[in-house]
Amino acid sequence: MHGGVTASTVQFSPTVPNMSPITDAVVLGGNGGLVFRWSGQKCCAVQVELNYMQRGWREANEEGAYARALHYIELPFLMHIYFGSPTVRGFVNLGPQIGYCVYDNSGIGTKQTSEVHQYNPIEKPFDWGIAGGLGFYVRSRKAGLYQLEVRYNYSLGTLFDNSLSAHFRNSNPMELSVNLAWLWEFKR
C-alpha cells in the first residue's frame, strides 16, 4: 500500500488568462492505493497499482479565485527497473495509466457561468496517459520494503471536448506526486 501528496494542474490550449503564473494553477491533494509487483527477472519487474488520486486546478484574478477538485480512480501498469544491493535499491517506473473521474465539484470561488468554458462540468471523465517515476527502497528482513517515489503523470486524454468546433484544443491534466509505500514480499 502507498500514499502521498499530489501537486496537479491542467494544461489548457488556448491558455486560460487567469492561470498565467504556474503557482496559481497548482492544486495540492492526496493519493493512496494498493501496489502489486511481480519480479520474475534479475533487474526488472511488472507493477500494477489501484489508486485514488485527487487532482484539480486553480485560477486567480481581480474578482477572486476559482478552484476545481477532481477525484480519480487510477490503474497504472508500470515497468519497474531496479538496481543496487539486495538491501537498498534505486528504481525507475514507466508505463501507461488509465483512470476515471468519480468526483467533480463544480468549483469554489468566483461566479461560474457557462460562458467560461473551464467552469462547465467535465465532458470526458475517462483518462489515459503516461506515468514515470524515480525512487528507492530499503528492504527490512521482517517488515517488508519501505519505498519513496517521485512520479510524474501526463494525461493524453482531455477533460473537455477537443473537436475542431470546441473551445479548447487541449485540456490535459498533469500531476507530480511524492509517495511513501510499504510492501510485503511473498516468496514462491
Language model regions located:
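Residues that define the transmembrane beta-barrel architecture of outer-membrane proteins
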Residues: D24-G30, A69-I73, V88, K124-I130, ...
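Gram-negative (and chloroplast) outer-membrane scaffold detector with strong preference
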Residues: V5-Q11, F36-T110, S140-K142, L176-E185
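Short glycine/proline- and aromatic-enriched beta-strand/turn motifs that initiate or cap beta-hairpins
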Residues: M1-G33, L183-R188
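Short glycine/serine/threonine-biased micro-segments
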Residues: H2, V27, N31, N93, ...
